[in-house]
Amino acid sequence: FLYYHGGGYSMGSPESHYSLVSYLADISGTTVYVPDYRLGPENKYPAQLDDGVKTYMSLINDFGYSHNQIAIGGDSAGGNLALITLLKLKELNANLPSSVALLSPWADPSGSGESYTEDMADRDILLGPIMKNVWKNDDELYHFYIDEKDVDKKNALMFPLGGDYKNCPPI
């Protein structure tokens, strides 16, 4: 299982997610790989996507796994990275992973979807306080990892909610 950690692309690490991924390894009986991908604001998009694809391909080319033996996933920004990695692999006509497992994926970093409401913020103990602060300050969290000049909200490799997942593995 290739698991991309969350942290808004600006924090988090394999170590910060040790407890979670250890639990996932225990209940699944499989090895869980957690790459230490580059973070913002020092490393801007597409550094994270490049690292996501490179790590997946390394499991195949360097470690001898078949794509059918690999599931990818992640939480929050790691869920975003799993989705954009999947879409990039599809674009490259690469062999896709067997499945994708997501925990509260950051599929719409712009926060422009209908599900981002004040009501949701009151119910979501993880993201609620963050979203309220973002709305209050009219801020965009994705600026931690995407340069303003590069933002393209229609690009599914940045904002995967609108991606084409036809012929992709189960998500």
Language model: regions and residue ranges:
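Alpha/beta-hydrolase superfamily serine-hydrolase fold, recognizing
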Residues: 1-171
